[in-house]
């Protein structure tokens, strides 16, 4: 799936939102802090959502 291979993008803003991204190198969904703007689609509000889309 294309979005699951996109890199983690924190973005330049400072909102400090806890999100999850799929790490295609390890095959796992991992937490990260998202700034709140200019991210990509490899950015999920929950671990469950990340695993559901990327099958981790």
Curated annotation (Swiss-Prot):
Disulfide bonds join 4-54, 13-37, 29-50. InterPro entries: Kunitz_BPTI, Kunitz_BPTI_sf, Prtase_inh_Kunz-CS, TFPI/VKTCI-like. It is found in: Secreted; Nematocyst. Gene3D superfamilies: Pancreatic trypsin inhibitor Kunitz domain (4.10.410.10). It comes from the Eukaryota. Residues 4-54 form the BPTI/Kunitz inhibitor domain. The keyword Disulfide bond applies. Pfam families: Kunitz_BPTI. Dual-function toxin that inhibits both serine proteases and voltage-gated potassium channels. Has potent activity on both trypsin (Ki=28 nM) and chymotrypsin (Kd=1.8 nM). Shows inhibitory activity against 4 of the 7 potassium channels tested (rKv1.1/KCNA1; IC(50)=142.6 nM, hKv1.3/KCNA3; IC(50)=40.7 nM, rKv1.6/KCNA6; IC(50)=154.9 nM and drosophila Shaker; IC(50)=433.1 nM). Has an anti-inflammatory effect in LPS-activated macrophages in vitro, specifically reducing release of TNF and IL6 but not nitric oxide and reducing expression of IL1B precursor. Negative results: does not bind to and, hence, probably does not inhibit serine proteases plasmin, kallikrein and thrombin. Has no or weak activity on hKv1.2/KCNA2 (IC(50)=52 uM), rKv1.4/KCNA4 and rKv1.5/KCNA5. A synonymy between H.magnifica and R.crispa is controversial. This is PI-stichotoxin-Hcr2f.
């Amino acid at each position: 799936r294309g979005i699951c291979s996109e890199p983690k993008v924190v973005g330049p803003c400072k909102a400090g939102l806890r999100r999850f991204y799929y790490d295609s190198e390890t095959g796992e969904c991992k937490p990260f802090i998202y700034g709140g703007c200019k991210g990509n689609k490899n950015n999920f509000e929950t671990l469950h959502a990340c695993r559901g889309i990327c099958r981790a």
